[in-house]
Amino acid sequence: MHKIVYLPLAESDLMDALGYIAYTLDAPKAARDLLAEFDETVQRIAEFPYAHELYRTDRPMKDEIRKVPVKNYVLYYAVFPDRVEIRRFLYGKRQRQDL
């Protein structure tokens, strides 16, 4: 099983999403459900890091990025021999040039 490392930007993305859903949309149960599915997805990634599709872009990227949907969001991560880095957690309809 790979060690999971959360980059600060990914942690911020997750907190922003949960806060928006819980407080702006006044849907705390939906926020809890999203967090539960996020946690389950990360556990699956730790066990099977290559199971999800590669993120394709025309721009050159230093690391190979993979993506997996989590409800209306997309989790982006990179796999290394000793760890998986959770890079971003973005709303599914958001533009991707900021990866």
Would you name each region that the model predicts?
Residues 1-37:
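Arg/Lys-rich, positively charged N-terminal/basic patches that mediate binding to nucleic acids
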Residues 25, 63-66, 70-99:
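Enriched for short, Lys/Arg-rich terminal
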Residues 22-25, 46, 50-53, 94:
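Secondary-structure transition/hinge residues
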Residues 43-69:
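A short, surface-exposed loop/turn module that caps and links secondary-structure elements
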